[in-house]
């Protein structure tokens, strides 16, 4: 089985915030790390990259009188370093839409769609002040259906209806706030309507697409899919390859979606296995996982599969599109201008990255919008990590060193009590349950199994009380600690996708190396035998004490310093 994993491509005009991170990048990384243990490292490919074309970059470059690529070069390198070096994101390939492989692939792919492309004259919003054609999302106004005053030119976030800039009441340019004019211009349209029935059938038949994804995609289908313009009058982008389309570029959403394929091709070219990419995009032995925010559902659940179908090349359609709801910050939407939220270059200076990774997965908004609060974040660290997991590990390992000189005692199966067999069963089942949830993209729900096992372990110790058993029956105390030590190995493997360094630390304390070589399907087995020597015991997690005033003061200092080092585009 081949597993393709993708996180939505971050747009390079802003540093991602914590909501962006958990919506795509971090979630995809956690799943990819799990998948490598489950299916084997050679069978998993995890890709993404910087989305760098389109109007926002073009506008910024004009303001600064520089080439757009000068801005995106800096921003791409900044984001890449943050993801790979700071946040421990395990991409096989983190690329960019300015990659020559990507640009060539997009142009070639577009020509394969020509059967479903038609040329139409359309009225496009044009800002006379900024002297630029405006993409749908660069026009805002009032929704004609529900009256929502902040609707975008492509969709209303309040009622979910599809829109065009022409439909908006009182449309405004998002760049300057002025009313745009509508100019006639010729564009190339991808006929989505040709795939209305196929998309509907695919969605309804899927056993793995989440309900929130199905709901949004089917609402598009029920309204009737309409042709969508795949060209723009922007200069900064991939030139449209169609005859007569000189001066036009490919709409960024269409080309960014194709980046999932081009990034896979690029990865295998880098490692000298140029044909291997096909194993992750064709055939029945492939599963593909996309981690995105809910605002990107239509593009991944409608437009991407329609393009793949239209190519006529039997590309694998998405297996799971794991779309998160929104993460709020202390009850409010993230806002850079209003200083609401934490951005991914600020967060590492407030808490250890490993803690952040765990916190964000525990707060992952899988079914509804979720509120990040510092009180809850610190509770997760101090109670779930320190008390539930860390304390359990310390209790078990300390007793093995104290009572058995650091050697795992032998298990005597004939002396097992009901509590022992019950906990052994819980150890075996925990990684299976977590795997079932992860396979559906339910990472927060899956992470609950880690805590259940740690809490069950603490309860097991309290019930069996090996510190008392050791006084009269060393063999029975040995049974308890053998089982408990084996549960720590299980915990370390389950914790690894979320907290790779902490999991490796626990694994090392158990006397093992290279947790990445473990196999998920063996995670619940009692493989640690008698006389196995454990290593020195050290503190796995520490409690964090912070109050809101301290956090806000520290954030102000961090932001002042970052303003000096962030790339021009990201300030």
Swiss-Prot record:
Protein name: Methionine--tRNA ligase
Function: Is required not only for elongation of protein synthesis but also for the initiation of all mRNA translation through initiator tRNA(fMet) aminoacylation.
Co-factor(s): Zn(2+)
UniProt entry tagged with the keyword Ribosomal protein: no
Binding, ATP: 336
Keywords, in A-Z order: Aminoacyl-tRNA synthetase, ATP-binding, Cytoplasm, Ligase, Metal-binding, Nucleotide-binding, Protein biosynthesis, Zinc
Catalytic activity, as annotated: tRNA(Met) + L-methionine + ATP = L-methionyl-tRNA(Met) + AMP + diphosphate
SUPFAM superfamilies per record: Anticodon-binding domain of a subclass of class I aminoacyl-tRNA synthetases (SSF47323), Methionyl-tRNA synthetase (MetRS), Zn-domain (SSF57770), Nucleotidylyl transferase (SSF52374)
Motif ('HIGH' region): 10-20
Keyword ATP-binding: yes
GO cellular component term, pick one: aminoacyl-tRNA synthetase multienzyme complex
UniProt enzyme class: ligase
Native species: Sulfurisphaera tokodaii (strain DSM 16993 / JCM 10545 / NBRC 100140 / 7) (Sulfolobus tokodaii)
Localization: Cytoplasm
